[in-house]
């Protein structure tokens, strides 16, 4: 085995000297065993990833764990390969760190479980699927107005407490129940408490059995936060390439991936770029995002929560992410305050799949009519607030009348929220969604009370609820 020794420790950056001509390759993992301070202390293994070659015999590495207690002269062992993580069935229902070590207090991962390196090339052109397929989620507002593409990348925007986590859980549940699909959740630089809550909520709702979770949270060194998204993606790619699955990959939060890269870049001594970000920002983002795609075998569809610093959409971090997105799902606090769940903004959410060539003429036409009706209602709200409904023309009154029904019908009960609401969750196929909204637009249900449309699934449930209310 190729061994070197530590010559310098600068926070999470460690320099290691090897014999001349025996430098480990870039991205190789080095192992350093930190001997316990006394006989009762446990020896700790720190993993370092090679980032730079310094001259003929030294490398600069980034630590994946705490470097507290590392000293010059400590031996570092070159593993001869990049960091690798366990893949396949053994990962389902488990929680891992960036190195693929189980952190859920369960049994350690068996030694014979297959492991894949986290650094790999994106699929080649000839492997990519050329057809654009819609991923049915069973969530009406998403399927109708901002449909997800298999192998696409979706940005999830929303402040605290508007329902990002519940929406993520419902997507995991629906993909598992209706499509038998696998989900991988990568927690990148977010709060440990949120990860813990999510794990327990998913265990309670039963979706954990179809999910692998990887966490590199806020308290971790920047190296771990920068690489944990790749660890999660590697697990997802295995399910796509070996098992032909349509996999959902959740990344929460993609901004923290960029932020960690910026910290590492500064520590490695690179010249900062705009707003202090790393000069390699676009390259790093591209290397991650290009691996998320659909091939002829299966697909990895990614849903990425995106934090926008100071609500500035021109900031280089979110702006670089936008270039890769196929759809956006915007959560709006005003809607959640009105009790409309999921609180997805039907006018701000977008998808490049919403075109007649991809979703079909009928779907496109109904979606656009729904948006036009809601937009007109939005414009009339100021007049209603000042003068009241009586001052509107008959035509405008009808628009408001239908828009409110549409707005309520965009809500639905979620399976994962059943234990809190006591209401049965609903999965609505796209055909049923289109049929329901088409009939509302045609005025077929103008006589039914508004409340009959709130938090229901299919249009038949509205009719049933309306009869009970009459």
Swiss-Prot record:
Keyword Transport present in the record's keywords: the answer is: yes
List the catalysed reactions: ATP + H2O + 4 H(+)(in) = ADP + phosphate + 5 H(+)(out)
Q: According to its record, how does it sit in the membrane? A: Peripheral membrane protein
| InterPro entries, per database record | AAA+_ATPase, ATP-synt_VA_C, ATP_synth_F1_bsu, ATPase_a/bsu_AS, ATPase_alpha/beta_chains, ATPase_F1/V1/A1_a/bsu_N, ATPase_F1/V1/A1_a/bsu_N_sf, ATPase_F1/V1/A1_a/bsu_nucl-bd
What the entry lists under Pfam families is as follows: ATP-synt_ab (PF00006), ATP-synt_ab_N (PF02874), ATP-synt_VA_C (PF22919)
Q: Where in the cell is it found?
A: Cell membrane
Give an example GO molecular function: ATP binding
Q: Name one GO cellular component term.
A: proton-transporting ATP synthase complex
Keywords of the record: ATP synthesis, ATP-binding, Cell membrane, CF(1), Hydrogen ion transport, Ion transport, Membrane, Nucleotide-binding, Translocase, Transport
Its EC number is 7.1.2.2
- Lineage, top-rank taxon, reads Bacteria
What's the chief localization of this chain?
membrane
Q: Which residues bind ATP?
A: 158-165
Q: How does this chain assemble? A: F-type ATPases have 2 components, CF(1) - the catalytic core - and CF(0) - the membrane proton channel. CF(1) has five subunits: alpha(3), beta(3), gamma(1), delta(1), epsilon(1). CF(0) has three main subunits: a(1), b(2) and c(9-12). The alpha and beta chains form an alternating ring which encloses part of the gamma chain. CF(1) is attached to CF(0) by a central stalk formed by the gamma and epsilon chains, while a peripheral stalk is formed by the delta and b chains.
Please describe what this protein does.
Produces ATP from ADP in the presence of a proton gradient across the membrane. The catalytic sites are hosted primarily by the beta subunits.
Q: Which family does it belong to?
A: Belongs to the ATPase alpha/beta chains family.
Protein name per Swiss-Prot or TrEMBL: ATP synthase subunit beta
- In its UniProt entry, the species of origin is given as Alkalihalophilus pseudofirmus (strain ATCC BAA-2126 / JCM 17055 / OF4)
Q: Which gene encodes it?
A: atpD
């Amino acid at each position: 085995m190729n061994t070197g020794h530590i010559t310098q420790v600068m926070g999470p950056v460690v320099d290691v000297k090897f014999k001349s001509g025996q430098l480990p390759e870039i991205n190789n993992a080095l192992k350093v065993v930190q001997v316990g301070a006394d006989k009762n202390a446990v020896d700790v293994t720190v993993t370092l990833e090679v980032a730079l070659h310094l001259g003929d015999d030294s490398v600069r590495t980034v630590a994946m764990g705490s470097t507290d207690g590392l000293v010059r002269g400590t031996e570092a062992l070159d593993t001869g390969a990049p960091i690798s993580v366990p893949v396949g069935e053994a990962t389902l229902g488990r929680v891992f760190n960036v190195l693929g070590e189980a952190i859920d207090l369960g049994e350690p991962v068996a030694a014979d479980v297959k492991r894949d390196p986290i650094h790999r090339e994106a699929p080649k052109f000839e492997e990519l699927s050329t057809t654009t397929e819609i991923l049915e989620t069973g969530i009406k507002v998403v399927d109708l107005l901002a449909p997800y593409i298999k192998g696409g990348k979706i940005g999830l925007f929303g402040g605290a407490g508007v329902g990002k986590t519940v929406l993520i859980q419902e997507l995991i549940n629906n993909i598992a129940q209706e499509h038998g699909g696998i989900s991988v959740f990568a927690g990148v630089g977010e709060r440990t408490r949120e990860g813990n809550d999510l794990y327990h909520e998913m265990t309670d709702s039963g979706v954990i059995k179809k999910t692998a979770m990887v966490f590199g949270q806020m308290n971790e060194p920047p190296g771990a936060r920068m690489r944990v998204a790749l660890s999660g993606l590697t697990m997802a790619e295995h399910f796509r390439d070996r098992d032909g699955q349509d996999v959902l990959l959740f990344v929460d939060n993609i901004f923290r991936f960029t932020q960690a890269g910026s910290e590492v870049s500064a520590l490695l001594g690179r010249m900062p770029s705009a707003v202090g970000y790393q000069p390699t920002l676009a390259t790093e983002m591209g290397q991650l995002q290009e691996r998320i795609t659909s091939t002829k075998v299966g697909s990895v569809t990614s849903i990425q929560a995106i934090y926008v610093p100071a609500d500035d959409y021109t900031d280089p971090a979110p702006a670089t992410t936008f270039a890769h997105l196929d759809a956006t799902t915007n959560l709006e606090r005003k809607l959640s305050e009105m009790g409309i769940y999921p609180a997805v903004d039907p006018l701000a959410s977008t998808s490049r799949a919403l075109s007649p060539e991809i979703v079909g003429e009928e779907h496109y036409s109904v979606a656009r009519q729904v948006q036009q009706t809601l937009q007109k209602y939005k414009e009339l709200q100021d007049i209603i607030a000042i003068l009241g409904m009586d001052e509107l023309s008959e035509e405008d009154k009808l628009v408001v009348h239908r828009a409110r029904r549409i707005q309520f019908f965009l809500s639905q009960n979620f399976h994962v929220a059943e234990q809190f609401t006591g209401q049965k969750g609903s999965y609505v196929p796209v055909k049923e969604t289109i049929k329901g909204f088409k009939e509302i637009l045609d005025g077929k249900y103008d006589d039914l009370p508004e409340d009959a449309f709130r938090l229901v699934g299919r249009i038949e449930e509205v009719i049933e609820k309306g009869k009970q209310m009459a």
